[in-house]
């Protein structure tokens, strides 16, 4: 709790959601108590509002059935299920909107088949990506690649549709021919999981919520990565005089102790790097 900058009287409980056969892509649902005002990080936010984290991203099978079940559970969606062609991938996408500002972006790839590295799954994978909506694509992309040393999976220019089309991120259909979105995808280690995506919407000006990305506010609070060399990350941040916090011997679930380094992306998203102490 102290690492979140909360008062001494604050308390927190959590539930950890994770497939039994994985060591990454876990989701921790945290409930803060006696921690001060709780308000949405991205109140009523749309894709053209920047700051904090926009959505978790999962792969699914039979997205129509998942959609039906999610609605019955009380979730809602940004749009109907939307088609998207990303390179060779023929995708169907929908963003589910749940309680406390949580958004889960679901992908079904119709073709080509998913890579074997995705692994087998019955209906839904663990999260493979976390999306940020950013004020400036170049600034965010360089932070992850040049400062943190992440590898690039994809980056490209703004994309607009040749004719009006249903947008998975909710850009109004009549504007999709003139309002573009610019994406970048990075990862600390190349693979099918552990990715971070940043999108800048060009042509629609929204709110900037970066100052609201903090506990105990509601939404996606932070993304954590294991890091074998926290000192190297700290040195990169200090060289550029960027904010950071370092915590040693933090109690971890399971009785372990970790060293923890915390920083923020240019759009306020909290990033934590941890190393389990031997």
Please provide the spans of the model-predicted regions.
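Eukaryotic phosphotyrosine signaling hubs
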Residues: 53-55, 128, 220-221
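Low-complexity, glycine/alanine/valine/leucine- and proline-rich hydrophobic stretches
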Residues: 202-203, 214-225
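N-terminal juxtadomain amphipathic helix
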Residues: 1-10
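Acidic, glycine-rich loop-and-strand cores that form catalytic or ligand-binding grooves
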Residues: 150, 183-192
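Glycan-recognition patch characteristic of GH18 chitinases/ENGases
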Residues: 45-46
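Conserved donor-binding loop and adjoining core beta-sheet/short helix segment
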Residues: 31-36
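Amphipathic alpha-helical segments
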Residues: 72, 136-152, 239
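Vicinal oxygen chelate
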Residues: 10, 15-16, 24-30, 55-123, ...
């Amino acid at each position: 709790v102290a690492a979140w900058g909360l008062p001494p009287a604050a308390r927190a409980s959590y539930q950890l959601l994770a497939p039994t056969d994985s060591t990454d892509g876990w989701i921790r649902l945290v409930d803060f108590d006696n921690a001060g005002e709780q308000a949405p990080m991205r109140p009523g936010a749309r894709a053209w509002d920047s700051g904090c984290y926009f959505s978790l991203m999962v792969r699914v099978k039979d997205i129509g059935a998942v959609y039906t079940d999610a609605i019955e559970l009380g979730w809602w969606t940004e749009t109907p299920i939307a088609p998207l062609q990303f390179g060779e991938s023929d995708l169907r996408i929908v963003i589910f909107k749940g309680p406390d500002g949580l958004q889960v972006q679901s992908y079904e790839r119709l073709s080509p088949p998913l890579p074997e590295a995705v692994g087998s799954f019955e209906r839904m994978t663990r999260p493979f990506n976390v999306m940020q909506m950013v004020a400036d694509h170049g600034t965010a992309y360089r932070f992850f690649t040049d400062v943190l040393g992440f590898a690039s999976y994809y980056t490209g220019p703004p994309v607009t549709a040749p004719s009006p089309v249903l947008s998975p991120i909710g850009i109004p259909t009549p504007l999709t021919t003139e309002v573009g979105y610019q994406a970048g995808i990075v990862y600390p280690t190349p693979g099918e999981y552990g990715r971070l995506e940043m999108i800048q919407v060009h042509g629609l000006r929204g709110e900037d919520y970066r100052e609201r990305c903090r506990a105990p506010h509601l939404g996606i609070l932070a993304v954590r990565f294991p890091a074998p060399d926290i000192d190297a990350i700290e040195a990169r941040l200090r060289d550029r005089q960027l904010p950071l916090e370092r915590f040693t011997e933090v109690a971890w679930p399971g009785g372990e102790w970790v060293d923890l380094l915390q920083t923020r992306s240019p759009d306020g998203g909290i990033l934590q790097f941890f190393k389990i102490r031997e």
